[in-house]
Amino acid sequence: METPFYKQIWFLGGIATLAIFALCFLAINMVGSPDDDDRPKVEMEVIATLQTNEPLMMIAREQGWIDADATEMTSVDAAEVDSIGTIFSGCNLKTFNEFRYFVGLKQITTEAFAHADQLTAITIPSQVVDIAYGAFADCPALETISVDTANTHYDSRDNCNGIICTWKGTLMLVAGCKNTTLSDRIGYIAPQAFRGCKGLTAITFPERMEEIGDSAFMDCSALKEVSVPQGVRFVEPATFMGCKSLQTVTLTKSVERLQKNAFKGCTSLSKIVCPKKYPPIIDEAFDSYDVTVYVPAGLQNKYFSDKFWKFFKDVKESE
């Protein structure tokens, strides 16, 4: 059996040495270890958007964020919160830039703010290191998204009005809104990044984007036209599902497969442009084939005879 630490100490100086040892032990505990809470200190400030929202104040009391009889929540209270779960899902907040005071928060979970249909603006706190896919799904009024500039894992560079993951190598847009702009440096769009963004009418992709995640633009009901960027090989499941205003889809030569439900519920779709010599595979991507397909000169018969593309209303050769 290993000798306990306290029995290995030789108190050669008697009581004096014991006293010195005790003081050293106390000093070590006062300094603390490197694992101590590293959340930044915040100045006391009332979070007005919560103070005037009694349903959320009730939740704050129930969660123990504030005392049971408290009538306000401050930035100091918010700094002690380390988990929000889906408490704000479906909330009636209009703006929540004071969310930045939740500096103890490390993770924003799936659907954390989903279905908050009045939310127009939010700022992500500095200490968040993990934002789940779909955290802001179905927030149709959202028009301003920013990240605290002290955050080392996410940012909103170039005033993009979105959340960009910066720590996984290639830049990935995790969440966007109707005013999001995509810089040429973004290589990925995360699953559900724009899901339910009903105010989005157009989107311009970087030319060399590599991947658009599943359900990324699901239920973007005002989106009218899409040009899939060069570099994307698969149109993932449900990517544009429920885009009821989508009229024209332009594919590129890099597209190999249209996955299940990719364009399901696109009731206005009337035109697909496909420049590939060999028709891409279609895996139940459409629920209607009342669409005219435009292909390069000399390929009409190839598409008409293809087991996937022969079901479309018409195939025409581009001039």
Question: What does each of the following model-derived ranges do?
Answer:
Residues 3-18:
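N-terminal Sec-pathway targeting helices
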Residues 37-55:
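N-terminal low-complexity, Pro/Thr/Ser-rich intrinsically disordered segments
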Residues 24-37:
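Hydrophobic single-pass membrane-insertion segments
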Residues 109-112, 133-135, 190-193, 213-216, ...:
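Consensus positions within tandem repeat domains that build extended binding/scaffold surfaces
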Residues 46-51, 67-82, 91-107, 116-130, ...:
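Structural signature of tandem-repeat unit edges
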Residues 51-65:
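Short, non-transmembrane alpha-helical segments in secretory-pathway proteins
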Residues 17-25:
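Alpha-helical transmembrane segments
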Residues 284-285, 301-312:
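Short, aromatic/basic amphipathic alpha-helical patches
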